[in-house]
């Protein structure tokens, strides 16, 4: 039973704005208290998310990531609706959103819990910041710098120093995003494993790796020139030599509402890879 729904739309997409209005009206007509807005509005008024039963995200993967960041602290599930090509995150399009909502209101669908990773930035023995990602945490060279040297330790055991454009630590969900483009393996999104992927590494015999779910990955910048820390493609925090980024699985999860059977992942995977 849905009592309160938040509808997140992309303000730069006419299709997303239009559908959000129509969907909000449709939900209200059926007795569902509905709030529509952009991510900044929901960040400024977190109670609008905390009080709802579901957030519907209308847009591409960027909109879904914004919805995830808004919802996982409150354990609120997200229904992603793709405007354009279906993606690895969104399995339904605008033509299915109304029937999908009816299915959910009638008790249908299932919860797809996705692992998150938590990254802590340390400098000189002090923790500067902490971040949570659904897809990946990346240390990469800045636009003007040469390759970066990133020393990687796993569970306090030194692995290697990558001389590369960057290093990715991804969740299983993120294995089909930037990590895949960088040559990493695809991991079933229901897995809690982590994926370590160097980006355009030079002179290394340590390839991409799938790590156990409780692995603690420490990446230390060993380059004199600066690098950047990105979390799900955002933040872009400047790093200096000696900075450490410690990544581990978060105790929190992000929950998606799914309407298709869970065994369709591999069929959908092949179809989307053929299209890309």
Swiss-Prot record:
EC number of this enzyme: 2.7.1.23
One Pfam family of this chain: NAD_kinase
Obligatory cofactor(s): a divalent metal cation
Catalytic activity: NAD(+) + ATP = ADP + NADP(+) + H(+)
Location of the protein in the cell: Cytoplasm
Location of the active site: 61 (proton acceptor)
Statement: the UniProt record of this protein carries the keyword ATP-binding: yes
Function (record text): Involved in the regulation of the intracellular balance of NAD and NADP, and is a key enzyme in the biosynthesis of NADP. Catalyzes specifically the phosphorylation on 2'-hydroxyl of the adenosine moiety of NAD to yield NADP.
Cross-referenced PANTHER family: NAD KINASE (PTHR20275:SF0)
Protein name (database record): NAD kinase
Protein's organism: Chloroflexus aurantiacus (strain ATCC 29366 / DSM 635 / J-10-fl)
């Amino acid at each position: 039973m849905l009592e309160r729904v938040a509808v997140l739309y992309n303000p730069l997409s006419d299709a997303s704005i239009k559908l959000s209005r129509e969907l909000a009206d449709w939900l209200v007509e059926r007795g569902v208290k509905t709030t529509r807005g952009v991510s900044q509005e929901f960040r400024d008024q977190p109670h609008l998310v905390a009080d709802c039963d579901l957030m519907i995200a209308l847009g591409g993967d960027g909109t879904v990531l914004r919805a995830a960041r808004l919802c996982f602290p409150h354990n609120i599930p997200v229904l992603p609706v793709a405007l354009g090509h279906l993606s690895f995150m969104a399995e339904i399009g605008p033509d299915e959103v109304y029937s999908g909502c009816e299915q959910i209101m009638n008790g249908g669908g299932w919860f797809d819990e996705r692992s998150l990773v938590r990254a802590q930035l340390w400098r000189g023995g002090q923790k500067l910041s902490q971040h949570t990602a659904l897809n990946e945490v990346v240390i990469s060279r800045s636009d003007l710098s040469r390759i970066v040297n990133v020393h990687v330790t796993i569970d306090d055991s030194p692995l290697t120093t990558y001389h590369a454009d960057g290093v990715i630590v991804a969740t299983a969900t993120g294995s089909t995003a930037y990590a895949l483009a960088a040559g990493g393996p695809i991991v079933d999104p229901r897995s809690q494993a982590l994926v370590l992927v160097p980006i355009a590494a030079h002179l290394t015999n340590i390839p991409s790796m799938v790590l156990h779910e409780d692995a603690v990955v420490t990446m230390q910048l060993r380059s004199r020139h600066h690098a950047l820390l990105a979390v799900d493609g955002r933040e872009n925090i400047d790093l200096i030599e000696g900075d450490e980024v410690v990544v581990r699985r978060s105790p929190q999860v992000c929950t998606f509402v799914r309407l298709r059977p869970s065994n369709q992942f591999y069929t959908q995977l092949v179809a989307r890879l053929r299209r890309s």
